[in-house]
Each structure stands twice: as C-alpha cells, then as structure tokens.
C-alpha cells in the first residue's frame, strides 16, 4: 500500500479545499485527462484556498517524468510539487490491460490514507475515468466516511451513453 510521504502539512481548516485528482497518468502532453490536470493546476496555482493532490503513474507507458516539467520541485523519489500541487507517483506492476484498474485502486488507496493520516476535512476526490468497476462502491463509502465527496468525470461512463445502447 502506497502512502504519500511528504508529511507536507497545510492549514486544515475550512479555508483550504483539498482536491485529489485520480485517473490521469501524468501532467502534460500524454492525453486529455493529463492536459486537463495540467491546465487546472496551472490556473489555480496561486489560489491559497485550493490544494491539489495529483496521482501520477511512476512507470510504464505514459509515466510521469517530472524532470521534463519547468519549475517542478522534487520532494522525494515519489513526490514533487508542480503548479503548487502535490504530485505523488504510483508504481504499477506490468500486468497488461489491468494496469489501469490497479493504478486507480492504488491511487485511491493512497488518497484515502493521506486524508485519514493528515485529518483532511471535507476533501474532494475527482476520478477522471470509471475504471474501478466493482471497487467503486467500496471507495465511495470509504471517502464519504472520511467526510469527503466523490466526483466522477462523465466521460468515464462513455459506455452508458444512449448512443451506444442496443
């Protein structure tokens, strides 16, 4: 189980909204979710009332290489700050197509552990793709029990759209 290591403490009061971004592989040019996260954190980087926590893929296709980002500050082997967001890397075993599910589950575990360990009040967990399938209910319940809210990108439910129905 991965634990966010930085120990980076913030004022944990109602003035700071902690937002955990799950589902993008990196920040930047890999794809749509990655570009969304890059632009979102860039736009809010000087806003002291929002603190982003971004899960990034540590290895494999589309992995996060923070050395390619201007002004990224390395905290540890698995963490760095970029656009004032705490980015944490999730190591993924090479297990074929199941990597995406493993990555999201590991990222959500790290997110929940960080919320609990740092006593984060009213966190928001934004999931960019619905790849967790049967694990969704477990994490929704766990995050709600920790006082958080879960937001799911509707594109993660592409298969549910009427245009694909038989």
What name fits each language-model region?
Residues 166:
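Membrane-proximal helix-turn-helix segments that form the acceptor-binding/catalytic region
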Residues 47-53, 120-121, 147-148:
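A generic structural motif
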Residues 1-17:
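Non-catalytic membrane-proximal stalk/linker segments that position and tether the catalytic domains
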Residues 32-40, 103:
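Conserved alpha-helical elements of sugar-nucleotide-dependent glycosyltransferases
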Residues 16, 21-30, 43-98:
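N-terminal strand-loop element at the rim of the active site
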Residues 99-110, 122-155, 159:
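An aromatic- and histidine-rich active-site surface loop
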Residues 114-122:
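Glycine-rich phosphate-binding loop signature in dinucleotide/nucleotide-binding domains
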């Amino acid at each position: 189980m991965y634990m966010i290591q930085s120990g980076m403490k913030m004022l944990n009061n109602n003035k700071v909204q902690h937002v955990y971004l799950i589902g993008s592989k990196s920040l930047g040019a890999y794809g749509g979710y990655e570009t969304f996260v890059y632009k979102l954190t860039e736009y809010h980087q000087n806003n002291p009332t929002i603190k982003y926590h971004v899960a990034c893929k540590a290895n494999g296709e589309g992995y996060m290489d923070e050395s390619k980002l201007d002004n990224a500050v390395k905290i540890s082997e698995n963490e760095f700050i970029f656009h004032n967001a705490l980015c944490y890397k999730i190591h993924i075993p090479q297990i074929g197509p199941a990597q995406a599910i493993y990555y999201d589950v590991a990222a959500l575990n790290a997110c929940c552990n960080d919320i609990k360990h740092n006593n984060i009040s009213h966190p928001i967990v934004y999931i960019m793709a619905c790849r967790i399938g049967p694990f969704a209910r477990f994490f929704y319940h766990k995050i709600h029990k920790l006082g958080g809210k879960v937001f799911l990108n509707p594109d993660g439910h592409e298969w549910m759209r009427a245009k694909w129905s038989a």
